[in-house]
Design a protein with these regions (language model features):
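Alpha-helical oligomerization segments
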Residues: 156, 160-194
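Generic, low-specificity signal for short hydrophobic/alpha-helical stretches with a mild N-terminal bias
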Residues: 5, 9, 120, 124, ...
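N-terminal, leucine/charged-rich tether regions that mediate assembly and partner docking
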Residues: 1-88
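Alpha-helical scaffold domains
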Residues: 134-136, 140-143, 147-150, 154-158, ...
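Generic structural signal for short, solvent-exposed loop/turn connectors between secondary structure elements
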Residues: 1, 74, 149-152, 193-194
Length: 194
């Protein structure tokens, strides 16, 4: 699936009941209901490790797991995906599946997602000399983030997050400026945007 090596396939179902039992505290209250409303089932499809693909492990990363999450709705809550990433305590590449579309998600300082695509449009390549560099490459493949010279991957993710935040603030200010009736306030808002 998605051009990952056959030797890495494990196809192990992950039952929600076990997750509810093991992480009862984290899934207390309405979190469990929201989790259940979004997620139908989960399957660990691949384990990318030194044993399965003959790529050297690092101190931080001994394996990368690929988790396929069958969704009940395309409008899922990102918090559920973040929670899955944090609960497992492993490096996870998450494949979200709804009807015939797929979306890749990965958590590296924050949740990064690709656009929804057909299965044949997605090709995951194992690029790197060790699992650390393979993980970094997965992050860039999923997010589309291009690491600029002099930045680490985490620094570049933070730069991209700041760009998104500023673009949202500009869009909000432009909307307020268009709605503003008083010309002086409108002029001041336009000046702030520029």
């Amino acid at each position: 699936m998605f051009d990952l090596p056959k030797t890495s396939e494990i196809r192990k179902p992950l039952h929600k009941k076990l997750i509810y039992e093991k992480y009862a505290v984290e899934l207390s209250g309405n979190k469990k209901d929201k989790f259940d409303a979004d997620i139908s089932r989960m399957i660990i499809t691949n384990e990318i490790s030194e044993a399965s693909v003959n790529i050297k492990a690092t101190e931080e990363i001994s394996a990368i797991f690929v988790l396929q999450v069958e969704l009940k709705t395309k409008e899922y809550d990102d918090k559920n995906i973040v929670m899955i990433s944090k609960l497992f305590g492993q490096k996870l590449l998450i494949i979200l599946h709804y009807e015939n579309k797929y979306q890749l998600a990965i958590y590296e300082t924050r949740l990064l997602k690709s656009d929804w695509k057909d299965e044949e449009e997605i090709s995951l390549k194992l690029n790197g000399l060790d699992l650390g560099s393979v993980w970094d490459d997965f992050v860039t493949q999923v997010s589309g983030i291009d690491v600029q010279d002099g930045n680490t991957l985490v620094e570049q993710i933070n730069v991209e997050a700041e760009k998104e935040k500023l673009q949202k603030q500009i869009a909000d200010l432009e909307l307020k400026a268009r709605k503003e009736v008083q010309s002086k306030k409108k002029f001041e808002m336009v000046q702030r945007i520029q």
